[in-house]
Amino acid sequence: ALDGLSPDGGAGAVSLLIAAAAQEEAGDLDTAVASLDALAARTDVPAIYRDLASFKAAMLDAGTDPAARRTRLEALANPGKPFALLAQEQLALADLAAGERDAAITRLNAIIQDAGVSQGLRDRVQTLMVSLGAPLPDALPSGDAAAVAAPDATSTNP
């Protein structure tokens, strides 16, 4: 179904992302990461696809050298990048894995305070902060910090 797509531009990038997903599903993570890295390096596709490929590669390459993964994520975590907050979340998890709880909490606080944070990401970050015993910020852009600390028993939100 993807054979008729041009290898250049957005459609070609999507086909390469789909191919990398198929490689991942087949258990060939090294090939999937290499395919995603190749897409991330291409200048003939829109930046959003390059950044997505780089983020997906970092997620698949989680078992490799923590410093290399951190470098990859830090490049995506810059303000204005489309996956900045997701990369910040992963960097906070890397901080925790490295035993740097305070750095992780600082990073998580910054995510919560960002006006562009999605509700799903905010919920994940708040839940993580509560599990770490960290105080939630007093003023959140939207939502209620108390709702995370004491969720409504009738809530249907998983």
Predicted segment positions?
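Short extracytoplasmic
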Residues: 1-14
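Soluble extracytoplasmic domains of inner/organellar membrane proteins
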Residues: 11-16, 20-147, 156-158
